[in-house]
């Protein structure tokens, strides 16, 4: 079973990622972004793997602009918080420039959630045996 971050947890990691506590400009969009990974369609998970769920969260946080500032940084942090809760962690050898370009491509609507889910594992360290798929 997957674990999901709370809105408060996301805002806490966002504060570290941004250097300030982001202001939620649109609470409805923020809540919608937070809930997207848990969506179901006809009783089945709309985003079946943890990578799909993290991609859906990252995509929503970056593209909906629910925050006054820091949407991209918060999206990246929230994505890795969700993945971390499920046993996946950012690689210690993270290519920061590649990660930045990845998030910028999401913000420019060049990547959909499916493409994001395919690419996220390249930013992760090798999977622990206890990690959720």
Where are these regions (language model features)?
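FIC/Doc superfamily catalytic core
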Residues: 1-133
């Amino acid at each position: 079973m997957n674990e999901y971050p709370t809105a408060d947890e996301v805002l806490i990691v966002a504060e570290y990622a941004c250097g300030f506590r982001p202001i939620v400009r649109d609470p409805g969009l923020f809540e919608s972004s937070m809930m997207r990974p848990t969506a179901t369609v006809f009783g089945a998970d709309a985003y079946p793997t943890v990578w799909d769920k993290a991609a859906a969260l990252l995509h929503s946080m970056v593209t909906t602009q629910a925050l006054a500032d820091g949407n991209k940084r918060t999206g990246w942090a929230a994505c890795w918080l969700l993945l971390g809760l499920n046993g996946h962690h950012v690689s210690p050898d993270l290519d920061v420039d590649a990660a930045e370009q990845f998030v910028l491509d999401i913000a420019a609507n060049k990547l959909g959630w499916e493409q994001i889910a395919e690419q996220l594992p390249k930013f992760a360290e090798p999977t622990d045996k206890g990690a959720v798929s």
